[in-house]
């Protein structure tokens, strides 16, 4: 299973990358806006840190606009993956970019059928948003499980990125279901590394070590 970090904060990306667990990065316009920096500058710096897929999202809503933005974005670095919205125009753009050999990540997926349409259009990745589904009392991880089953049934190679991850349980369930990727906020990555019994064990070892004759 791959871990992407879901942020545009370069400091967070550097710190998580130093742990040796980050395989890629996902960004979106909201995350870029929080950085207060130019979009292209942020993406360039991220590609210098992480040698893996970097999802960068278009903001155009029409096919031609999406393609124009995508073709500019991929000039930044070969690892750029174009994030496209799950709309009919987004599907058209996915098909076009697939034909050009450009990788795509169809985002804002909230149903198995949306994921299937994206896979059929040639998406490299689909991103179901589990946290947002949970927020409206739907079963976010259940949707991921259904997508996994459908893709396996028909041999789709489109990878599933579990997005809108809110807690370590989302990551655990993603791994158990067989999702290809979980894209995780920095704070949740840090939570994954912690356990109170680990802290207690370290404390006990150090206390015992102090008793050893020096």
UniProtKB/Swiss-Prot annotation:
Its main location: cytoplasm. PROSITE patterns: TRANSALDOLASE_1, TRANSALDOLASE_2. It catalyses: D-sedoheptulose 7-phosphate + D-glyceraldehyde 3-phosphate = D-erythrose 4-phosphate + beta-D-fructose 6-phosphate. The keyword Cytoplasm applies. Keywords: Cytoplasm, Pentose shunt, Schiff base, Transferase. GO terms for biological process: carbohydrate metabolic process; pentose-phosphate shunt. Transaldolase is important for the balance of metabolites in the pentose-phosphate pathway. NCBIfam families: fsa_talC_mipB. Belongs to the transaldolase family. Type 3B subfamily. This is Probable transaldolase. It comes from Geotalea uraniireducens (strain Rf4). The gene is tal.
